[in-house]
């Protein structure tokens, strides 16, 4: 069993015993469910020379039950000191409990990594629960820019993380293929089509899409229809162009996502919701629940009275679910609003029977959070669904020290394809995970082309390559040691230097780290972990290169060499597993 999992279970047993004893001496009923409300958090040490693992459980219990945290910490120490795998326990600060684990417990864990059984520690966390993750969902009005890549990679890697930990995952893209923006897209394409037919450069009015990427769509229309569309009325040619434009741009979006290894299982059409009369049925359902009414909205803050005309309209009572205002369900022309479409779409997700529904939104959609929560609360009658909304903050593309501004409307943006052609898939995917999703990310094109520590994917891949080179060299030059290693007869207790043990301790935290990453929907933890593992391995490599006593291959000591080959293999195994989840190539030679 993983060291962290075993320690957590044993702390839980002791915590339950302590809490029950405190409950028995208290008349307060507020402590009845205390065991369920106090999480046991284990942190690996930042100072490996003093302890291995720390927990603040005594401080949490003390705060909840009005006790002295130092006294409780010492009680934990007394009860846990007898466990055979724990070498030492110390109390620090206001009640942190610091554990030193027996050295052989760490070294023995290498066998679990080498035989692959470590995966069992997290492969059933999800218990086959169904998860829907919606990510990207950019309007099909133009190519995806590098800012979209962040949500794309975050969603794709989160899906992979959930799958490898036992969840059933549906990757989804909501296609906004109707409404004003699609009308404007069709008008823009028509002007490009006209340009192709007449040879005269189109003048694109403000509010439309001026990007030259639409010329190719205009060319396709010209090949299929000749000049026929020029003879049709605007409603007639727009109806034709809308479908062609959306289909072409959606195919372009799919192709760009494929470049960086991002895929979706479902592309859900908003237009189909309108065409199938589903929206009306869902609104009727909310009307029965008395969540819909006819009324007037207040004048929006900051809007001039000259531009505001109050009108009676159909509204959803989203404020009773915590939204800051009720939401319109219909436009002035009587057609359904975007919000009404969102309600029908959410209802569809609920009916598909998901246990978790995750929305991944860009920073410009933060205002949607309260609306989505209101919709789910209104529709999920039995509260069976766990909703989570994740915001992906901005990506600042840096070129030569200057931030590049991006806008589809202005036609000035750096596409995913542009960046892919410079740095490739692996760099894009890894770097998008080097910070938590809700933190702004600077994407420096110059640094990410370097073969240095500033290029994190190179740094991790290079650790994998270096470890592999050790094995190849040993196979050719240390046959006896390689035979001991390859027949699983390595003596891990020979790995006794401080640096070797530090590396093993990082390897052993993999499953614990992954458990936290999936439960908090934080795949960036994998990238951060891999960088730490690579750094520790490179440090050991450099030490062994300069000191005969630290070399991986010691020609006069086959048993020590075999143990160090096992350590190098364990490093490769965990890096391979981490890169597999992130969707990055493991290279053998650099």
Curated annotation (Swiss-Prot):
Belongs to the class-I aminoacyl-tRNA synthetase family. Gene3D superfamilies: Arginyl tRNA synthetase N-terminal domain, HUPs, Isoleucyl-tRNA Synthetase, Domain 1. GO terms for molecular function: arginine-tRNA ligase activity; ATP binding. PROSITE patterns: AA_TRNA_LIGASE_I. It is found in: Cytoplasm. One of its GO terms (cellular component) is cytoplasm. It catalyses: tRNA(Arg) + L-arginine + ATP = L-arginyl-tRNA(Arg) + AMP + diphosphate. Monomer. One of its GO terms (biological process) is arginyl-tRNA aminoacylation. Its main location: cytoplasm. PANTHER family: ARGININE--TRNA LIGASE, CYTOPLASMIC, ARGINYL-TRNA SYNTHETASE. A motif ('HIGH' region) lies at residues 138-148. This is Arginine--tRNA ligase. InterPro entries: aa-tRNA-synth_I_CS, Arg-tRNA-ligase, Arg-tRNA-synth_N, Arg-tRNA-synth_N_sf, ArgRS_core, DALR_anticod-bd, Rossmann-like_a/b/a_fold, tRNAsynth_Ia_anticodon-bd. SMART domains: Arg_tRNA_synt_N, DALR_1. Keywords: Aminoacyl-tRNA synthetase, ATP-binding, Cytoplasm, Ligase, Nucleotide-binding, Protein biosynthesis. It is an enzyme of class 6 (ligase). Its EC number is 6.1.1.19.
């Amino acid at each position: 069993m993983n060291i962290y999992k075993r320690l957590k279970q044993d702390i839980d047993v002791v915590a339950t015993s302590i809490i029950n004893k405190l409950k028995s001496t208290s008349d307060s009923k507020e402590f009845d469910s205390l065991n369920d409300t106090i999480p046991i958090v284990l942190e690996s040490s930042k100072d490996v020379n003093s302890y291995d693992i720390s927990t603040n459980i005594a401080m949490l219990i003390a705060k909840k039950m009005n006790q002295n945290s130092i006294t409780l910490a010492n009680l934990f120490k007394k009860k846990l000191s007898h466990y055979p795998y724990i070498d030492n326990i110390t109390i620090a600060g206001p009640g942190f409990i610091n554990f030193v684990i027996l050295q052989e417990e760490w070294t023995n864990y290498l066998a679990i990594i080498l035989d692959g059984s470590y995966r069992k520690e997290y492969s059933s966390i999800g218990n086959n629960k169904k998860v829907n993750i919606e990510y990207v969902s950019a309007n099909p009005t133009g190519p995806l820019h590098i800012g979209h890549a962040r949500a794309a990679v975050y969603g794709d890697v989160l899906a992979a993380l959930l799958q490898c930990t036992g969840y059933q995952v549906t990757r989804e893209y909501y296609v906004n293929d109707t409404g004003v923006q699609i009308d404007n897209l069709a008008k823009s394409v028509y002007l490009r089509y006209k340009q192709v037919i007449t040879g005269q450069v189109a003048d694109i009015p403000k509010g439309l899409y001026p990007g030259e990427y639409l010329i190719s769509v205009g060319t396709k229309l010209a090949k299929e229809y000749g000049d026929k569309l020029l003879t049709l009325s605007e409603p007639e040619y727009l109806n034709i162009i809308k479908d062609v434009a959306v289909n072409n741009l959606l195919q372009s979006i799919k192709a760009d996502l494929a470049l960086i290894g991002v895929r979706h299982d479902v592309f859900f059409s908003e237009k189909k919701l309108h065409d199938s009369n589903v929206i009306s049925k869902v609104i009727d359902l909310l009307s029965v629940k008395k969540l819909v009414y006819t009324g007037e909205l207040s004048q929006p803050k900051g809007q001039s009275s000259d531009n505001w005309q109050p009108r009676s309209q159909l509204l959803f009572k989203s404020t009773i679910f915590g939204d800051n205002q009720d939401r319109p369900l219909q436009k002035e022309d009587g057609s359904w609003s975007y919000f009404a479409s969102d309600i029908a779409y959410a209802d569809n997700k609920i009916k598909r029977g998901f246990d978790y529904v995750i929305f991944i939104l860009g920073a410009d959609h933060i205002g949607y959070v309260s609306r989505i929560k209101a919709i789910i609360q209104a529709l999920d009658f039995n509260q069976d669904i766990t909703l989570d909304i994740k915001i992906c903050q901005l990506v600042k593309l840096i070129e030569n020290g200057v931030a590049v501004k991006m806008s589809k409307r202005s036609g000035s943006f750096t596409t995913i394809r542009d960046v892919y052609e410079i740095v490739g898939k692996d760099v894009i995917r890894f770097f998008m995970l080097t910070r938590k999703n809700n933190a702004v990310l600077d994407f420096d094109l110059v640094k990410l082309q370097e073969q240095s520590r500033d290029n994190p994917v190179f740094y991790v891949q290079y650790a994998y390559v270096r470890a592999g080179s050790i094995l190849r060299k040993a196979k050719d030059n240390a046959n006896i040691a390689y035979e001991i290693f390859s027949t699983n007869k390595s003596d891990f207790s020979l790995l006794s230097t401080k640096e070797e043990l530090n590396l093993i301790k990082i390897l052993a935290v993999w499953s614990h780290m992954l458990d936290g990453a999936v439960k908090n929907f934080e795949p960036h933890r994998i990238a951060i972990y891999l960088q730490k593992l690579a750094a520790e391995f490179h440090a050991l490599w450099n030490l062994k290169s300069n000191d005969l006593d630290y070399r991986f291959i010691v020609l006069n000591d086959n048993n020590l060499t075999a143990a160090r080959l096992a350590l190098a293999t364990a490093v490769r195994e965990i890096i391979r597993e981490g890169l597999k989840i992130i969707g990055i190539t493991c290279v053998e030679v650099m």
